[in-house]
Amino acid sequence: MAVGILGTKLGMTQIFDQETGMAIPVTVVQAGPCTVTQVKTPDTDGYTAIQVGYHEVKEKALTKAEIGHLKKIDAPPLRHLKEYRLDDSSQYQLGDAIKADIFNPGDLVDVSGKSMGRGFAGYQKRHNFKRGNMTHGSKNHRLPGSTGAGTTPGRVYPGKRMAGQYGATQVTIRHLTVVRVDSDRNLILVKGAIPGKPGTLLNITPAKTVGK
């Protein structure tokens, strides 16, 4: 396991490859800085991990338990806490800062965030169902079709694709390429689109490769 970083989506832009001149669509992420708020060891917690905090806020935005937890290490009030499992946490100390420079251009990362909510959506928008004929006497324009058999089973199976809430769910986009890192301003430029709208909280971790 490896340490990731929490960040905020700022928006999308494009940069140009210096060799080919091609435009590369990128998402700009404000990555950190995060503060190490807890170091977990097998002796005290049964496993190895570190907890990091991100986004300083006023104390009234946190619960008393959260404020007490952070005051143990004299950390400022941090809105978001995230834990990363590690094989060895000895290199981290309470209060250490984790910044954007933990990544380098060319690294592959997984980005998790909450997708944009689109409210109650129908079958075509939510599941890309094919619509019916709009002419020739058809009355089946945007209907779903069959939802199952009759008396047996006598119900709609769970998981049946139907109209409902679309978006506003946790989404992970895997194997995105880090194009550029601005360590002075803690900015990471990631190739392609990532979940959410500007201001969305993101979790950026080194990409997980199956079998490794």
UniProtKB/Swiss-Prot annotation:
Annotated GO biological process: translation
Keywords of the record: Ribonucleoprotein, Ribosomal protein, RNA-binding, rRNA-binding
Coiled coil location: none
Top-rank taxon: Bacteria
Pfam families on file: Ribosomal_L3 (PF00297)
InterPro entries: Ribosomal_uL3, Ribosomal_uL3_bac/org-type, Ribosomal_uL3_CS, Transl_B-barrel_sf
GO MF terms held by the record: rRNA binding; structural constituent of ribosome
Stretches the record annotates as Disordered: 130-155
GO cellular component, one term: cytosolic large ribosomal subunit
Family, as annotated: Belongs to the universal ribosomal protein uL3 family.
Function field: One of the primary rRNA binding proteins, it binds directly near the 3'-end of the 23S rRNA, where it nucleates assembly of the 50S subunit.
Subunit note: Part of the 50S ribosomal subunit. Forms a cluster with proteins L14 and L19.
Protein name, entry field: Large ribosomal subunit protein uL3
